[in-house]
Amino acid sequence: MKSIQTPSKSHTNTKETPVMSQEETKGYNPREIEESYYKIWETRGYFEVEGNAQIQKPNQNFAVMLPPPNVTGSLHIGHALNHTLIDIMTRYKRMDGYKTLWQPGTDHAGIATQNVVEKRLLSKGIKKEELGREAFLEKVWEWREESGGTILSQMRKLGTSPAWSRTRFTMDEGLKNSVARAFVKLYEEGYIIRGNYMVNWCTHDGALSDIEVEYDANKGKLYHLRYFFKDSSDYIVVATTRPETFFGDTAVMVHPEDERYAHLIGQTLVLPLIGREIQIIADSYVDREFGTGMVKVTPAHDPNDYEVGKRHDLEFITVFDKEGYLNHHAGEFEGLERLEAREAIVAKLQEKGYIEKIEEHENQVGKCYRCGNVVEPYISKQWFVKKEVAQKAIERINSGEAAFYPAQWKNNYNAWMKELRDWCISRQLWWGHQIPVYYCDCGHEWASETTPSHCPKCQGSQFHQDPDVLDTWFSSALWPFSTLGWGNGEAGKGSWWREEDLQEFYPNSLLITGFDILFFWVARMLMMGEHFLDNLPFKDIYLHALVRDEKGQKMSKSKGNVIDPLELIEKYGCDSTRFTLAILCAQGRDVRLSSQQLEISKNFTNKLYNAANFLLLNASSFKTLDEITPQTPLGRYMASRFSLCVEELRGALDGYRFNDGATVLYRFLWGEFCDWGIELSKANKEAINELGAIFREAMKLLHPYMPFISEHLYQKLGGARLEESTSIMILPYPKANWREEKIEMTFEVIMDAIISTRRLKATLELANQKIPVVFIKAPQGMDESLINTFIPRLAKVDSIELLSEKPAACVVDVGEKCEIYLSTAQLDLSPIISRLEKQQEKLQKEVDKLLGMLNNEKFVANAPQNVLEQNRVALKEAQTKLDKVKVELQGIKG
């Protein structure tokens, strides 16, 4: 394919900030390069859908959505991983000729945003209720305009390339319209219903869906209470972890087949302190083997009791209000906060003789995922999406219409969907999408996409809108298609979205997100996309794991191990940070982020920079592989290895094996090109121009992972500057089309012979001396002229002789591809043998000692884990050294 030359005049912006040449600085300065290049890329529109128009292939489209971060948020290390992976795929597809859309945007984050603004107002002594709903919402919008774009600007520092001109917000006008349409359609289809249900209730944030409740282990108490029979001194004992809710008991239940209590069914008990009468009932829900086999029933404050209450038509008594304060049903305790009331209630029960015993007890306590408050089961009138709306999405996932990466997440998805319940979508907040349902004084209820002027039934104007807002995840569930114009009306048409977007970009090609929101977000997008567009929203779903510290611990402020990605970028550069995250990201495994790997990545950028400088010492500029065909043996060899790199890298990226792709790049660029290609060129200067062309082409491969240094070195090696040239990011991605296995085999022997000769000379303490001759036993068919071109120069040998049998009086080094023999006729080997034998003896003792300790069961049982790990590492190192000495001795002794 012809290479793209200089940019069109529209891409030559005289106002672009010049990038300081690296010759004017001390080494590679990523900070300067990154800021300057990013401005040029964004100004030229490269990130947009038509940014690569000149290389786009017909009917090749790629779409990926940014999981919209909270508008309140700032970039954390999980974002950095997620955005890096998305950007790698986006840049790869863009260079490969796809019309590419990476859709950016932010989420209005109902609870989080309202909390932030409420706290700001409270710091000024203002409560939101004093302002009223409309004035408060104005304050939220003001805050959003001031601070809501922070995370998007931080994303730029990571080198990401979304279509910024299309940035959406889940409460922009178009998405408001989309949300209203989705709600009304589901409402009219009977999939959205309203009713009194038991919900998870946070006294601060209101109703929560099941997956918004996080469960923590709690060391509490189990209170055994005496419930006396009516007009009797006899009693039964029931247990509870929440004595403050017993005021809502409306029965005690036993198993209908439990002979111990059959005679008690139907008898009347009297509740302690308040004297209300309840009956003993029979229900098969009771586990006869657990505790006493008698269970108190509190239908308004326990989800299982709620179902029992419905079966037996029990009274549902709510004992505290929405703020968590006990009501009149609690008698003298009315007005106390539910958790603070516990101590007073228990004290009173003890005083009156109603406590049988109190035991220590560990249980799981549900807490609000936002504020950490203890969540209560609470009966409330709420809006729900019926679980049946998800059924077709489940079927289509299991028919293979979308694939999970790693594949095991499909099992997790199915397991969760099997237990799916109706989704509570109403929230008692002011900030968010207000539920588009209206209530008229005439009693009529209806849903409308637009604000109505009158009641459609009585034509009257005395109506009001439901005060609740939708769960934030409702609007996020529409993200893969609402951002493409579905339900937007005319809002944003031609700027945020285009007429053809749904046809070109739905279903999205790929979703990349964390596994932790599989159920919050991914499952809901699947069901909404299937329901409204009759197609799953993604072809592939890649779920990455957590980023942990180098010890494998989850990051938390309390541990002090939180890593700020912006600090990493400042210290190591954007490219090094991205490359580290990618090379550590193996499918299904947590990312263990370490300073050691970051240093390795930083050294990698310096290695590349130094390689380019070496090439430029020999030529002022280099062409590309589109313009020249390698002719020298070294050029052909490196071109063949480059082609293998292309093949393996494409395979890794197409399978979302980001770590494998990074490893392929590292192996080729450092291990093959820098370590060997440049080294071998010292004996073959004619290959320099070809190596320069290959290195430039390799920068295209590197670009999705390390966009800045790849751009810089590509331009620099071409004798150009980005200000006057087309960016590497819209040049065609290389294809694998050049393999020469025979020449690869020859150079493998050459390199192996150089390594073996150097190793043998070092063993014989001749490393810096030039020796007259080395004998090589190699596979047949080797090009003798090539062997004599490279080995003598790089191994410091006068001559090479190929042979088929081992010569007499020689020491040997057996490599992977050949055997090297060096004559010992003129050498006294006894001091070397003596030294190596002493080393062998010392190392053997060390290995035996460590093995003895690690095989000692008592030592292993009592030693700290870090000591055991240190000993295992020491054993591995000692064994490696011992094996090396043995090989050297064997080679010398023949």
Curated annotation (Swiss-Prot):
It comes from the Bacteria. GO terms for molecular function: aminoacyl-tRNA deacylase activity; ATP binding; valine-tRNA ligase activity. InterPro entries: aa-tRNA-synth_I_CS, aa-tRNA-synth_Ia, Anticodon_Ia_Val, M/V/L/I-tRNA-synth_anticd-bd, Rossmann-like_a/b/a_fold, tRNA-bd_arm, tRNAsynth_Ia_anticodon-bd, Val-tRNA_synth_C_sf. Pfam families: Anticodon_1, tRNA-synt_1, Val_tRNA-synt_C. It is found in: Cytoplasm. It catalyses: tRNA(Val) + L-valine + ATP = L-valyl-tRNA(Val) + AMP + diphosphate. It is an enzyme of class 6 (ligase). Keywords: Aminoacyl-tRNA synthetase, ATP-binding, Coiled coil, Cytoplasm, Ligase, Nucleotide-binding, Protein biosynthesis. ValRS has two distinct active sites: one for aminoacylation and one for editing. The misactivated threonine is translocated from the active site to the editing site. This is Valine--tRNA ligase. The lineage of its organism: Bacteria, Pseudomonadati, Campylobacterota, Epsilonproteobacteria, Campylobacterales.
